């Protein structure tokens, strides 16, 4: 079973990702992880932190000479601002006099609407939102991207699967509804200021961000992740927790600020008749083919051989420059919410994080299906399965003769 967990706070010494259950022999380097983390910092509308934040990656265990060893993989991402926060975020007790002299340690008692501040303070008994926001911060997603980088390397090397994303819409801009991009389009997408696949959509998104920035506001949006090259049969119909669509939705909804997930055409299919909602099948030269992909590559909780399409809706960032009304938890008085350094829009970066979570779930499903202790063994199992599937589809291929 592939498992992952992260640790660390936004302004702590470092973030840590631990990935357990990865097979031996997968090629991965700290440079690969750094490149994906750099993609996470992309995007028009990011805040000042992105201009000086550098992700200092150290692979602590589970990899030797660029190959995974089969044991738990630990990745550390150092915080380059740690010297500024060393006293405030120290793990050992600190002299109260030192803390009293630090402006960074001022109590944060005015929770931000839409953030974890309020519920977290009440649930854990904190008088200050600092312990909540430090862990709830989207900075934690850097560790998820690190783990996801290893998963996507496994998917590429074991199955030839590619995972990519693009931004569909930002704020009220009209959503892009054209054909999804392919792996060859990813450099151009990453070169786009908003990681858009369509140039006209890109300009509309930039205009929305500029307007929100001028008004002291923030924006959300929608990203789409596409996974290409998946075999038929990852996931299962046998029980709800084995359904791949449920696993994907849970993983993506677990990302900070994500408020909605759909697979394929998702909610649009609810407004269609059945004859216009499903993907009809026909005999093809290599087996069954389809002319549409409304299901987004999943039927009955299993991959069906079509490209996987997952969309995620991100809410506007909770730290609004114009400051929203709240209650000071120390006094009970009306107040304006605390303001932490933040972005106007982080939707382009969210696409990279959703890629990582989709890759992790797909890698787990592939290892559950094909097993193996080494990449070579997993590949042998995959090859045997694909041959068996091709034999089962042979009658459909003969139907086109």
From Swiss-Prot:
EC assignment: 4.2.3.5
Q: In which pathway does it act?
A: Metabolic intermediate biosynthesis; chorismate biosynthesis; chorismate from D-erythrose 4-phosphate and phosphoenolpyruvate: step 7/7
What reaction(s) does this enzyme catalyze? Answer: 5-O-(1-carboxyvinyl)-3-phosphoshikimate = chorismate + phosphate
Q: Which CDD domains match?
A: Chorismate_synthase
Q: Which cofactor does the UniProt annotation name?
A: FMNH2
Q: Which residues form a coiled coil?
A: none
Q: Which PROSITE patterns match?
A: CHORISMATE_SYNTHASE_1, CHORISMATE_SYNTHASE_2, CHORISMATE_SYNTHASE_3
Q: Which UniProt keywords apply?
A: Amino-acid biosynthesis, Aromatic amino acid biosynthesis, FAD, Flavoprotein, FMN, Lyase, NADP
Q: Where does FMN bind?
A: 135-137, 256-257, 300, 315-319, 341
Question: What is the enzyme's main class?
Answer: lyase
Q: Which GO terms describe its cellular component?
A: cytosol
Bound how, and how many: what does the cofactor note say? Answer: Reduced FMN (FMNH(2)).
Gene Ontology MF annotations: chorismate synthase activity; FMN binding
Please provide the Gene Ontology terms (biological process) for this protein. Answer: amino acid biosynthetic process; aromatic amino acid family biosynthetic process; chorismate biosynthetic process
Where NADP(+) binds, per the record, is at 40, 46
Q: List the disulfide bonds.
A: none
Q: Which InterPro entries match?
A: Chorismate_synth, Chorismate_synth_AroC_sf, Chorismate_synthase_CS
Please name the Pfam families in this protein's record: Chorismate_synt
- State the PANTHER family in the record: CHORISMATE SYNTHASE
Function text: This reaction introduces a second double bond into the aromatic ring system.
What family does this chain come from, according to its entry?
Belongs to the chorismate synthase family.
Note the subunit structure.
Homotetramer.
Q: What is this protein's record name?
A: Chorismate synthase
Lineage, opening ranks: Bacteria, Bacillati, Actinomycetota, Actinomycetes, Mycobacteriales
Gene name for this UniProt entry: aroC
């Amino acid at each position: 079973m592939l498992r992952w967990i992260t640790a660390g706070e936004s302004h702590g010494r470092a973030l840590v990702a631990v990935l357990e259950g990865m097979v031996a022999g997968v090629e991965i380097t700290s440079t690969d992880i750094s490149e994906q983390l750099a993609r996470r910092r992309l995007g028009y509308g990011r805040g000042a932190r992105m201009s000086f934040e550098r992700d200092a990656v150290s692979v602590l265990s589970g990899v030797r000479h660029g190959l995974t060893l089969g044991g738990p993989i630990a990745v550390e991402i150092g915080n380059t601002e740690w010297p500024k926060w060393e006293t405030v975020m120290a793990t050992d007790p600190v002299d109260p006099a030192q803390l009293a002299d630090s402006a960074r340690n001022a109590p944060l008692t005015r929770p931000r609407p839409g953030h974890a501040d309020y519920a977290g303070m009440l649930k854990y008994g904190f008088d200050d939102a600092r312990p909540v926001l430090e862990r709830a911060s989207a900075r934690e997603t850097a560790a998820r991207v690190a783990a996801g980088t290893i998963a996507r390397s496994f998917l590429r090397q074991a199955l030839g699967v590619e995972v990519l994303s693009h931004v569909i819409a930002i704020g009220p801009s009209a959503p892009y509804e054209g054909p999804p991009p392919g792996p060859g389009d990813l450099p151009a997408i990453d070169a786009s200021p908003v990681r858009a696949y369509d140039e006209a959509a890109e300009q509309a998104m930039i205009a929305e961000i500029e307007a929100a920035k001028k008004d002291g506001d923030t924006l959300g949006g929608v990203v789409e992740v596409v996974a290409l090259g998946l075999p038929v049969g990852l996931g299962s119909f046998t029980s709800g927790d084995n359904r791949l669509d449920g696993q994907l939705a849970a993983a993506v909804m677990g990302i900070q600020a994500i408020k909605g997930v759909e697979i394929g055409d998702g909610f649009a299919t609810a407004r269609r008749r059945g004859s216009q909602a499903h993907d009809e099948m026909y005999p093809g030269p290599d087996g069954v083919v389809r002319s549409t992909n409304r299901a987004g590559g999943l039927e009955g909780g299993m991959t069906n051989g079509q490209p996987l399409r997952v969309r995620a809706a991100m809410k506007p960032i909770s730290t609004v420059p114009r400051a929203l009304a709240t209650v000071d938890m120390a006094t009970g008085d009306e107040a304006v919410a605390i303001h932490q350094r933040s972005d106007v829009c982080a939707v382009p970066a969210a696409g990279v994080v959703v890629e990582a979570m989709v890759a992790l779930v797909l890698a787990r499903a592939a290892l559950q299906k094909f097993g193996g202790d080494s990449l070579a063994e997993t590949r042998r199992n995959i090859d045997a399965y694909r041959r068996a599937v091709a034999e089962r589809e042979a009658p459909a291929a003969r139907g086109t003769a």
